[in-house]
């Protein structure tokens, strides 16, 4: 059993250790890594999960080479890493995904940020932002849409989000949960937790929910020890 853990924007693989510990004690091997442009990884820019999802798909393929094609592989991500984990569903079918404070749609996220902080409607900015990203970084920021990757995918997804998140509103996780089709998918909201702080605010409860989710998926506390 292997858990691949994806960190958030501006941090590196060391921020994943607090999550890796949960999986390690649950019998999982863990993979932590620096996403492109962060830490010791190369890269000139970040694509908020679009190209990073292909990197995670390559990591999954590598894990299967080492542990076998039938090994259990799950993803955990925080913030941008959570969006990356969900976007990976376009390329791979992991056994589960745990997404902590993801955004559902990049355009919606930018619209909310602009309205909240600059009081500018997104219609004035979005075409310029898309053209600039396409010209300078060769990617379409509007295509970074985790909810589109989730739709129709029969993968159990556990969504975790702080209700006091001031960067990505918890309503993004509510939207994503509604798009989930696997009956083992879950949504858990943490009172008074700001962005990516749920595990800090309520470590014991966070770990309990992760292990309960894995148990419901048949991957913890069962005879499945792959």
Regions found by a protein language model. Name each.
Residues 166-172:
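Conserved alpha/beta-hydrolase "acid-adjacent" motif
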Residues 177-196:
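Catalytic histidine neighborhood in serine/cysteine hydrolases
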Residues 87-139, 148:
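Hydrolase active-site cap/lid region
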Residues 4, 9-22, 35:
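The serine-hydrolase catalytic nucleophile loop
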Residues 152-154, 159-161, 165:
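Short beta-strand/loop motif that positions the catalytic acidic residue
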Residues 193-207:
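Catalytic histidine-centered segment of alpha/beta-hydrolase-like enzymes
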Residues 20-42:
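Conserved alpha/beta-hydrolase
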Residues 46-67:
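Alpha/beta-hydrolase active-site loop
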């Amino acid at each position: 059993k292997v858990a691949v853990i994806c960190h958030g924007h501006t941090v590196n693989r060391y921020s994943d250790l607090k999550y890796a510990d949960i999986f390690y004690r649950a019998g999982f091997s863990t993979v932590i890594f620096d996403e492109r442009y962060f830490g010791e990884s190369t890269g000139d820019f970040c694509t908020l999960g679009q190209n990073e999802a292909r990197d995670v798909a390559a990591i999954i393929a590598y894990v299967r080479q080492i542990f076998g094609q039938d090994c259990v592989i799950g993803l955990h991500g925080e913030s941008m890493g959570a969006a990356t984990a969900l976007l990976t569903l376009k390329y791979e079918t992991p056994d589960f995904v745990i997404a902590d404070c993801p955004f559902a749609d990049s355009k919606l996220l930018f619209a909310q940020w602009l309205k909240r902080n600059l009081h500018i409607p997104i219609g004035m900015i979005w075409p310029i932002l898309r053209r600039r990203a396409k010209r300078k970084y060769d990617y379409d920021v509007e295509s970074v849409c985790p909810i589109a990757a989730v739709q129709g995918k029969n993968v159990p997804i556990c969504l975790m989000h702080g209700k006091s998140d001031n960067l990505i509103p918890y309503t993004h996780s509510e939207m994503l949960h509604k798009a989930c089709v696997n009956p083992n998918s879950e949504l858990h909201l943490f009172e008074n937790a700001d962005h990516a702080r749920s595990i800090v605010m309520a470590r014991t409860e966070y770990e309990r929910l992760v292990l309960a989710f894995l148990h419901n998926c048949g991957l913890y506390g069962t005879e499945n020890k792959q």
